[in-house]
């Protein structure tokens, strides 16, 4: 067996989501996913992980996607639910794209700077060969190639601008920077903002070739691009 979701179901999802975005749907979008369906094939040896970053970089992206395919094949999609996967490399993975170290344990991922630099010493640039950026693209490309539009592949959690900056200036330092160097914080934030869009566009260039539409870390479907504004850092200001 394969993933149980027909083109007709997809069309229904698209129509209901479009009406919801326009404020024309007289109910909330309700997604129900029930496990227990027979996947019709043996379970892959690759384990299931909540964080895609938990998989060793030596594991081919195609094997990660095969694990996802198996898991999706066990699900009954009800209501407004649809098959969707989220390449989860940690909240604010742009920090890793820009040079932070990505750390992992058995529960989560986080980012640390490789050097303790002052705000004025930070330099951000787009690096197409960054190991984590390449991994995200490889996984997304493998997913798109495997499913050819049957499964919605979400945008990874790029993060909020100040959240990304706080990975380079661990939060207590960035709090002081807001007082001591507010203009420098703004300047660095706009630099990250520009790069954020570069990363979004680069990943989207892969996803939009076959994806039914757009989702992010929330599986809310949209025919047009969207992403949530977010700033976890702001609660400490």
Task: Annotate each PLM feature.
Residues 1-50, 66, 71, 78-86, ...:
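Active-site loop segments of alpha/beta catalytic cores
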Residues 49, 53, 112-120, 237:
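Short, solvent-exposed coil/turn linker segments
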Residues 53-62:
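Trp/Phe/Arg-rich N-terminal binding region typifying the photolyase-homology
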Residues 84-122:
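A contiguous, low-structure linker/loop signature
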């Amino acid at each position: 067996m394969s993933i149980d979701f027909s083109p007709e179901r997809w069309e229904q999802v698209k129509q209901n989501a479009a009406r919801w975005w326009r404020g024309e749907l007289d109910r909330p979008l309700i997604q129900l996913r029930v496990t227990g369906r027979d996947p019709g094939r043996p379970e892959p040896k690759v384990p299931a992980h909540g964080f895609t970053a938990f998989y060793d970089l030596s594991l081919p992206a195609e094997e990660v996607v095969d694990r996802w395919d198996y898991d999706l094949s066990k699900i009954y999609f009800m209501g407004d639910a649809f098959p969707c996967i989220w390449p989860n490399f940690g909240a604010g993975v742009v920090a890793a794209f820009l040079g932070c170290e990505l750390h992992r344990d058995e529960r989560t991922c986080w980012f640390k700077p490789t050097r303790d630099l002052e705000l004025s010493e930070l330099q951000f640039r787009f690096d197409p060969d960054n190991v984590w950026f390449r991994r995200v693209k490889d996984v997304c490309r493998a997913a798109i190639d495997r499913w050819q539009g049957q499964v919605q592949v979400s945008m990874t959690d790029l993060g909020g601008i100040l959240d990304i900056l706080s990975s380079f200036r661990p939060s207590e330092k960035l709090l002081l920077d807001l007082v001591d160097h507010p203009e420098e914080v703004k300047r660095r934030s706009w630099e990250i903002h520009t790069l954020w869009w570069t990363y979004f566009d680069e990943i989207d260039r892969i996803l939009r070739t076959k994806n039914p539409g757009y989702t992010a870390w929330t599986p809310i479907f949209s025919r047009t691009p969207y992403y949530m504004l977010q700033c976890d850092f702001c609660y400490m200001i």
